[in-house]
């Protein structure tokens, strides 16, 4: 968990994959505001590469780029909103949303946080570092992530969310630079985004199993909301 929370289990993973395309389409539309050409728009390039890695249909990807760049004549406006607070049992949470209607999203978040606590802006942000997060896998077995991190300019690294992957951590401004440098160090980039890493993560083993289940259920409910892009949680592991 440690940084970005992800659904577990086959059914949840399949459902999460379906949601992933919708979330990536939003990210693409927002990034495309800066131009429809990934070659000259690094933010768009990163999310397009991620979309291709997860096999987003080409027509869906291209439609999102055109829509975001204003080439279809459709008005597209998504607002980036962060919600901060605590899951049950005082586990800090940061929820990143892209919404076309904050007046809809805000009350939905208040309802979802009833089993925890919705805080004011900055209430838990102090306990997270804003970082670049690059998940990558070795091209060949035995590639050294420490050497790759040093040579590519990453600040740190740790095991990734998926088995066999590495999560490279960067300064926010170095995200694109490091993601471009990693392939030369023997790592294929799976995803690259800005996110929040907890400074003082709670060990899940320190929670009663029933309490941990309550935390997981809370996070799953938050993640299921259509306006939620990412959920960052202060749990280790």
From Swiss-Prot:
Natural source organism = Polaromonas sp. (strain JS666 / ATCC BAA-500)
Cellular localisation: Cytoplasm
Statement: the UniProt record of this protein carries the keyword Manganese:
no
Protein name according to UniProt: Probable transcriptional regulatory protein Bpro_2928
Principal place of residence: cytoplasm
Report the record's Gene Ontology biological process terms: regulation of DNA-templated transcription
Q: Which Pfam families match?
A: TACO1_YebC_N, Transcrip_reg
Which keywords does this chain's UniProt record carry? Cytoplasm, DNA-binding, Transcription, Transcription regulation
């Amino acid at each position: 968990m440690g940084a970005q929370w992800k659904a577990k289990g086959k059914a949840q993973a399949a459902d999460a994959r379906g949601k992933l395309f919708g979330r990536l389409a939003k990210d693409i539309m927002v990034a495309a505001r800066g131009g429809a050409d990934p070659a000259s728009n690094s933010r768009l390039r990163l999310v397009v590469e991620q979309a291709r890695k997860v096999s987003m249909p080409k027509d869906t990807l291209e439609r999102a780029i055109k829509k975001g760049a204003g080439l279809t004549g459709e008005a597209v406006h998504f607002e980036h909103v962060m919600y901060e607070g605590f899951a049950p049992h005082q586990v800090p949470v940061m929820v990143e949303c892209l919404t076309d209607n904050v007046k809809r999203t805000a009350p939905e978040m208040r309802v979802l946080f009833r089993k925890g606590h919705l805080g004011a802006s900055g209430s838990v942000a102090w306990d997270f570092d804003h970082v670049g997060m690059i998940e990558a896998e070795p091209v060949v077995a035995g590639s050294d992530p420490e050497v790759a991190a040093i040579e590519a300019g990453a600040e740190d690294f740790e095991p990734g969310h998926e088995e066999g992957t590495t999560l490279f951590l960067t300064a926010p401004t170095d995200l694109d630079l490091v993601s471009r440098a990693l392939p030369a160090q023997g790592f294929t980039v799976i995803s690259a985004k800005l996110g929040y890493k907890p400074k003082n993560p709670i060990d899940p083993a320190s929670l009663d199993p029933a309490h941990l289940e309550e935390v997981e259920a809370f996070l799953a409910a938050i993640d299921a909301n259509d306006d939620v892009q990412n959920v960052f949680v202060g749990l280790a592991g």
